Amino acid sequence: MRSSLTPLGPPVSRDRVIASFPKWYTPEACLQLREHFHGQVSAACQRRNTGTVGLKLSKVVVVGDLYVGKTSLIHRFCKNVFDRDYKATIGVDFEIERFEIAGIPYSLQIWDTAGQEKFKCIASAYYRGAQVIITAFDLTDVQTLEHTRQWLEDALRENEAGSCFIFLVGTKKDLLSGAACEQAEADAVHLAREMQAEYWSVSAKTGENVKAFFSRVAALAFEQSVLQDLERQSSARLQVGNGDLIQMEGSPPETQESKRPSSLGCC
């Protein structure tokens, strides 16, 4: 099936156009070391053979303790603002960001979940169906890093095993420097490996690494979506081409008599 999808609404902004595969933050804890899109994905994009990928919203869930800066991170990327007046998220909120990846329209639905214990039962209902789970912590507070284990466990419980990309993100990078930053990142990289997650350090205040991080998230999710769609197309072709007859609604059922070959000889 060839795709003739066009973006819904106005063209995406230039900083949402991804032509090449975004690089990882550190090779010591990354989900994909390749520097290019998967060959099948590149070929499908060139042929515009990406099925319905351009019409779907891929769900991204951001979890973590109160005050780690989840909302600030999302607002810096989606609105390019940094609000110094903190307001806790009540329940859940979300933003939709549109991209153009390898010439194909693609959208992320980014869910901002509350960090307060009293909202956990509400937020957990929105973990389901996530393609990406971002576990955020404060680089200046080691306790928030330790808590990411539980946040990730809660989010994974609502999704099928192996179905989600996992990112561990250290926020407030602008508040650390030198040896303190190196130690905090080393601890985080160690945990990211345990989680089978990709690690990033960012600053919502300065914007450092924020765009690069979300571009990486979008590219990995897009690549997976295209590969899954190609697999579905392949499975559909196999089912149609396996030699079985397709019974049309209203047509008479086939009998053993009708299956016999007709004799066309003279009597």
From Swiss-Prot:
Name the UniProt record assigns to this protein: Ras-related protein Rab-36
Subcellular location: Golgi apparatus membrane
Chain span(s) of sequence motif Switch 1: 76-94
Motif Switch 2 positions after renumbering to this chain: 113-132
UniProt note on regulation of activity: Regulated by guanine nucleotide exchange factors (GEFs) which promote the exchange of bound GDP for free GTP. Regulated by GTPase activating proteins (GAPs) which increase the GTP hydrolysis activity. Inhibited by GDP dissociation inhibitors (GDIs).
Tissue occurrence: Ubiquitously present in all tissues examined.
Domain of life: Eukaryota
Cytoplasm found in the keyword field: no
Lipidation (S-geranylgeranyl cysteine): C266, C267
Keywords tagged on the record: Golgi apparatus, GTP-binding, Hydrolase, Lipoprotein, Magnesium, Membrane, Metal-binding, Nucleotide-binding, Prenylation, Protein transport, Transport
Organism this protein belongs to: Homo sapiens
Family: Belongs to the small GTPase superfamily. Rab family.
Any one GO MF annotation of this record: GTP binding
Function: The small GTPases Rab are key regulators of intracellular membrane trafficking, from the formation of transport vesicles to their fusion with membranes. Rabs cycle between an inactive GDP-bound form and an active GTP-bound form that is able to recruit to membranes different sets of downstream effectors directly responsible for vesicle formation, movement, tethering and fusion.
Residues at which Mg(2+) binds: T71, T89, D112
